[in-house]
C-alpha cells in the first residue's frame, strides 16, 4: 500500500462518475452541549496519514492512521473521515443497510426518535454506531443521474473511550453544495438530535460523551474502502455496493455452525413439543407458545407455526406419526377458520384452544376482527404448498379435500377483491405476501383471475418501489417503516411470478420478474449481517455468538433476529436460477447460523 497524504488527490484515483473527494482530516476537540466543541485540521503533535491501495477500477482501500506524539494525554478527542459528494443534497439518496434506506421515505418528515429519516434538508444528519449496520457501508446515490459513492468500513470499537463498548460511527450529513459520508470515533445522532442512538423501539435514547482520550504514543487506525459507480438498468447503486460488501467480508463459512440435518431434526422435535389437543372438542394443532405459558393458541402466519408444520412434516418424512398430525392439524385449521373468511379473502388467524374464540393476529390487543394480509398470505401459502406436496409426492397418504375447499375460498375472494375497479392499492408492501399464494392457486385450481390479481398487486409494488422514492416497507407487524419483511413479501411474490413465467414460456415476463425479484431480494439481503460483531461480557460472549447470517429487523427495530431463516429457501432458488453460488452459500450460512443460542431444551437462550 502507498502511504501519503492522499485526501487532496483521492478523487483522481477513481472513475469520475460522481463528483466526490476525500476531505482533509479534521480533529474534534472538546465537548459541549452534547457534541464536539470545535473541529481543527491541525492539532500539534497529532500526525495523520493515509495508506491506499487500488482493489479494482471502482474500489480503493484506505487505512487512515492517527499517531499522538504528545507527552500527555489528549482528552475529549473525536477522529473523523469525511467523503464529500457534490450535488443537490435532496436528490442524493442515502443508503445505510438496515438503518436508512434511501432516507426511509415511508416516515418522511418524522422528527421524533421512532424511525430515522433523511431528506437532504440543510442541517440534517444521520449517524449510527457501526455495530448496527449489517452490511457496513454508507452510500449516497443521485436519483437523477444514478451516480453514487459509498464508503465501506471494517467495523471496530474505539480504544480510550469514556463510555463502555464505544464503537466507531458511520452516516451522512448535508454539506454546502452536497452531502458527506462521515465516519466518527463515536458520536452519533439522527432526526436533528445529536448524541442519541436508535436503541429503543419508539424513541431515541441519549448517548452522550462519546469522545476518546489519546495516550502518549497511541496509534489509531481505521480501514475503509471508497467505491464509486453509476446505477444501471440491471443494478442500482445499493446493489453494486452489496456485491462489494459480500466480496469484502465473504460470509460463506457454514461449516462452523451445526449441520443442516441435525438442525432439521431438532426443529422437528421442538415443533412436536408444541402439539396440543382440546379441551375444545376436536381441536388440535401446534401451539404458538411454550407449554408452560398461560395461553393455548393456534396461530396461522407471522409468528405462528400452526399451518407450517402441516406442510413441513410430511416433506421431511421422519416418522409415520407425523403424517397424522399434519392431516389433523390442517383439517382443523381449515374447518375452524373457513367461516371467518371475509369478502376480501382475509380471515381470522388465531384460535384459542381453551375458549374456542377466533381472533386476529395479536390476541393480546383483543383483535376480534379479520386477520391481516401478512398472516393470511403466509398461512394460505403454507396450505397450498401442503396440497401441492400431498398431491404430487404424498402417494395418497393425505386427504386434501378440506384444505382445497378452504384455500380455494380464500384465493377466490382475495382475487375478486383485488380485481375490483374501486380496489384501493395497499399503502405498504405487507399485502405482498398474498402474491405468491395467488400464483400457486391460479395453477392449482385453474383460476386465471388469481394470476391476474397477483400480477396486478405485484405491479403496484413495481411502480412504487423500483426506484428511489419509496422502499419496501410495512411487513413487520410491530413496526411501520422500511423492513426486510416487506422486501421479502415482494421477493417471494416476484419469485413465484418468475417461476410461472418460465413454466409458461413467457420470455418477456421472465425478464421482468427476474429483475424485480433480484431487486427485492437484494434490498432484503442488505439487512443481513455479513460480519461477526464482538460483544461485551455477557451471555452472547459467553456463547461466542457469531452474528454473521442473522438479520436486522427494520429501521425502527434495529436489533438482530432469526427471521432471515424463513427467506433462505427463496434465496437458494434465486441462486439456482441465476447460477450464483454466492447466494446458495449465503442461504446455508443464514439457516445454520440462526440455530445458535438454542439450548438442549430447544428454547431460545
Where are the model-predicted features located?
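Generic secretory/membrane-interface signal
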Residues: 2-3, 15, 136, 300, ...
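Short, intrinsically disordered, low-complexity terminal segments
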Residues: 6, 16-17, 504
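Carbohydrate-recognition beta-sandwich/jelly-roll modules
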Residues: 22-403
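Glycan-recognition and catalytic cores of secretory/periplasmic carbohydrate-active enzymes
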Residues: 232-605
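Bacterial N-terminal signal peptides that target proteins for export
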Residues: 1-10
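Hydrophobic h-region of N-terminal signal peptides that target proteins for export
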Residues: 11-20
